[in-house]
């Protein structure tokens, strides 16, 4: 458990974290979060789009971090239900220090430069403008971040470690819920009576931006992320891949 603490942040590399991930594979998420807070303090941040996983992580974090830090990427295309949930979460966790980070250009500016419905014609470019660049800016002050990724969510996430090296940004990334199942997530939500997006009750297991070609409902038993970028080869927005 002391491997991170024993090395300066600049000395942590992929090999170190792969070893640590194997050691931590069976640790409870709360223990991983406690270690992350102990090692990185105010250089640690939670990425939250207010999915159930990030709300669970926040509920766990407040037990070990008096004023947890998080950021929310305001793409300009969120469902109204997502924005309403943000307010409910802030009311539930008033100690949360939330930074709202937006793109460098408004939706109107993007439409003027690239034309309307860029998300339909070139979703990678739209995600780069509205998600990836803001994410990189949001993470710049930090040395480590926490995400709600789970292996069960999609094949592209099937090999993630509970802790890993984010080589793109040169920092540590924690995935404390990597081993959790869909059933575990919702059992925790119910047990703790946590707020969640009502769209989950309407067939949306994975919620991103509101255009239906970016986020659509899926059939029972289908891949939870199959409603994202429907009809496209795209499987990730670029935040985690």
UniProtKB/Swiss-Prot annotation:
Gene3D superfamilies: HUPs. InterPro entries: PAPS/APS_Rdtase (IPR004511), PAPS_reduct_dom (IPR002500), Rossmann-like_a/b/a_fold (IPR014729). GO terms for molecular function: phosphoadenylyl-sulfate reductase (thioredoxin) activity. Pathway: Sulfur metabolism; hydrogen sulfide biosynthesis; sulfite from sulfate: step 3/3. Residues 221-241 are annotated as: Disordered. It catalyses: [thioredoxin]-disulfide + sulfite + adenosine 3',5'-bisphosphate + 2 H(+) = [thioredoxin]-dithiol + 3'-phosphoadenylyl sulfate. One of its GO terms (cellular component) is cytoplasm. Its EC number is 1.8.4.8. Its main location: cytoplasm. It is found in: Cytoplasm. The active site is at residue 237. CDD domains: PAPS_reductase (cd23945). Coiled coil: none annotated. Pfam families: PAPS_reduct (PF01507). GO terms for biological process: hydrogen sulfide biosynthetic process; sulfate assimilation, phosphoadenylyl sulfate reduction by phosphoadenylyl-sulfate reductase (thioredoxin). Keywords: Cytoplasm, Oxidoreductase. Catalyzes the formation of sulfite from phosphoadenosine 5'-phosphosulfate (PAPS) using thioredoxin as an electron donor. PANTHER family: PHOSPHOADENOSINE PHOSPHOSULFATE REDUCTASE. Belongs to the PAPS reductase family. CysH subfamily. HAMAP family: CysH. This is Phosphoadenosine 5'-phosphosulfate reductase. It comes from Gloeobacter violaceus (strain ATCC 29082 / PCC 7421).
């Amino acid at each position: 458990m002391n491997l991170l603490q024993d090395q300066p942040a600049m000395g942590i590399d992929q090999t170190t974290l792969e070893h640590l991930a194997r050691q931590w594979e069976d640790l409870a998420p709360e223990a991983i979060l406690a270690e992350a807070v102990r090692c990185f303090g105010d250089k640690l941040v939670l990425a939250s789009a207010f999915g159930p996983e990030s709300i669970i992580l926040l509920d766990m974090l407040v037990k070990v971090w008096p004023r947890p830090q998080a950021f929310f990427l305001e793409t300009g295309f969120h469902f109204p239900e997502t924005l309403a949930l943000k307010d409910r979460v802030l009311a539930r966790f008033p100690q949360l220090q939330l930074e709202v980070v937006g793109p460098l250009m408004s939706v109107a500016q993007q439409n003027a430069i690239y034309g309307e419905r860029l998300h339909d014609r070139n979703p990678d470019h739209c995600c780069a403008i509205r998600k990836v660049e803001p994410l990189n800016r949001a993470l710049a002050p930090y040395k480590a971040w926490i995400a709600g990724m789970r292996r069960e969510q999609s094949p592209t996430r099937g090999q993630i470690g509970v802790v890993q090296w984010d080589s793109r940004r040169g920092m540590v990334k924690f995935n404390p819920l990597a081993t959790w199942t869909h059933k575990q997530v919702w059992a925790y939500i119910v047990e703790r009576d946590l707020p969640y997006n009502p769209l989950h009750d309407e067939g949306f297991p994975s919620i991103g931006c509101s255009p239906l070609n970016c986020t659509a409902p899926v059939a029972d038993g289908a891949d939870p992320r199959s409603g994202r970028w429907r009809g496209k080869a795209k499987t990730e927005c670029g935040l985690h891949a």
